[in-house]
Amino acid sequence: MSKNLLTFEDVSVNFTQEEWQWLSDTQRDLYRKVTLENYKSLVSLGIPVYKPAVISLLEQGKDPWMVQKKGARDTCPDWQYVFKGTEFISKQDIYKESAKVLTMGRSHFSSSLDCPDLKEDHENEDWFKNRLGRQEVHSHQLFITHKEVPESEIRGCNPSCQAVHQNAILDVPQCSSTKERIDQSEPQKRSYRKKSVEMKHKKVQVEKRILKCSECEKVFNQTSSLTLHQRIHTGEKPYACVECGKAFSQSANLAQHKRIHTGEKPYECKECRKAFSQNAHLAQHQRVHTGEKPYQCKECKKAFSQIAHLTQHQRIHTGERPFECIECGKAFSNGSFLAQHQRIHTGEKPYVCHVCGKAFSHRGYLIVHQRIHTGERPYECKECRKSFSQYAHLSQHQRVHTGEKPYECKVCRKAFSQVAYLDQHQRVHTGEKPYECAECRKAFSNSSSLAQHQRSHTGEKPYICKECRKTFSQNAGLAQHQRIHTGEKPYECNICGKAFSYSGSLTLHQRIHTGERPYECKDCRKSFRQRAHLAHHEKVHTMESFLSLSSPSPSMSSQLPRTLGLIS
């Protein structure tokens, strides 16, 4: 029989009134429980099931025994039995099973043990619970009474089995005696206590058989779980994002993904009020506060708060790089690095700032960028209490206090605290300017200079002073401006102790002590401490050239030396 044609009758057992009277209260409770569970299981599997009368009786707390119809065969109604076969069985097997059932009602119960086919049944657990526990998908349904086994067919059995069948048939009239019926029930009552384990085991087998993946044999408790699992094998992804078209196999995954576009973060940390789009991310974050690191590397004993971080770390020891770019063949130790790298080829920038609309290829870049708008600086220096928006910037800053300059130029031996500064410096020697403005084709030696330059075309000024709302195109410009409000003068002259708010002002001041005049006029070889003074001086020569062409008066010529004397 097909699994789809499973019916309530296939997993049910009916009792007559007299049969029901034989059962103890415990056995009746077990019958009620199993029968109701079977019915609920069929309904939960989506199988169309009418509500049988026995279910209605059980739900109302009434006895579920069935009335024996008049005019039935002259057999003991107590032995009316529904036999459920689990396979396509032969007639001989049918008679063997029938013999087991029929013999159990006899007063000479022990004589049936001579048949080897019946010994197993008596050695097993409770016959009653076996009846309730037959819940496999059945292929035969046989209604058997004492007199339904033709004598001619019994001849196919072995002699001991034939005796059992003969005795079972001949002794049927004895069941009409109340005393004999009570005597006969004693072996059954003793046998009833044995098969609850088998019944429950068979029930689980049915559910597993119905909810098993045909590809990998994995078993599930619910059809919905099986359906979701099978999409792993089929690759089906029926849930698509209307924003970006990305598809998912589960609706829950789509719901999580949508929060990237909406910015929704419903899960908030009670410690720091930081919010997350997924509950799992919140659970991981909370380990920052608790310090819990349950995942430890067996090689170096380093511990991690997330198992994914441990997995990635272990690839340092193994050298494994399983994620390879199909475009350029570059390999990575984890999938997120590969995904980020592939955006170089695709140009994809899925992370958009909701304030200014700027897009980024990495989520981390967006988070750092958003701190420009919020002013958040979560990383603080313990030495000077200065705070930073990025941890990398804090690490770089701390070298100011330690004096560490680990990056040295091989050409001039100049050392730097940051590798980026070394890279920029080396372009002084090479003359390389790899960053070119698409608007005016002007080239720069570093990307930050290009980014700052491009704002001259766009007019963008993303850095806002919270005090006076003045805007700036560069963060450095904002930082300098804020010292007007704070009165901070961090740059102090080592010679005279005078302090300045800008490093450039200190540099100019120190030239007074050193006598340095780095800006020289090409016309008269006169030198100046500041570029602005040189530019002003050069206008004098421009004026002289103009006057010589127009024959200036002696009075105007006499004023030129006085003007030159002012700019020294």
Swiss-Prot record:
Q: Where are the zinc fingers (C2H2-type)?
A: 211-233, 239-261, 267-289, 295-317, 323-345, 351-373, 379-401, 407-429, 435-457, 463-485, 491-513, 519-541
On whether S-adenosyl-L-methionine is a keyword of this UniProt record, the answer is no
Q: Name one GO cellular component term.
A: nucleus
Q: Which PROSITE patterns match?
A: KRAB (PS50805), ZINC_FINGER_C2H2_1 (PS00028), ZINC_FINGER_C2H2_2 (PS50157)
Q: Which SUPFAM superfamilies match?
A: beta-beta-alpha zinc fingers, KRAB domain (Kruppel-associated box)
**Superkingdom of this entry's organism?**
Eukaryota
Q: Which GO biological process categories is it annotated with?
A: regulation of DNA-templated transcription
What InterPro entries does the record tag this protein with? KRAB, KRAB_dom_sf, Krueppel_C2H2_ZnFinger, Znf_C2H2_sf, Znf_C2H2_type
Location(s) in or outside the cell:
Nucleus
Instruction: State where it is primarily located.
Output: nucleus
Q: Which GO terms describe its molecular function?
A: DNA binding; zinc ion binding
The UniProt entry, under Pfam families, shows: KRAB, zf-C2H2
CDD domains assigned to the protein according to its UniProt record, in alphabetical order: KRAB_A-box
Q: Which UniProt keywords apply?
A: DNA-binding, Metal-binding, Nucleus, Repeat, Transcription, Transcription regulation, Zinc, Zinc-finger
Ranges of residues in domain KRAB: 6-77
Gene3D superfamilies per UniProt = 6.10.140.140, Classic Zinc Finger
What is stated as this protein's family in its record? Belongs to the krueppel C2H2-type zinc-finger protein family.
Described by its record, this protein's role is as follows: May be involved in transcriptional regulation.
Q: Name the chain's protein.
A: Zinc finger protein 583
Q: Which organism is it from?
A: Mus musculus
Q: What is the lineage of its organism?
A: Eukaryota, Metazoa, Chordata, Craniata, Vertebrata
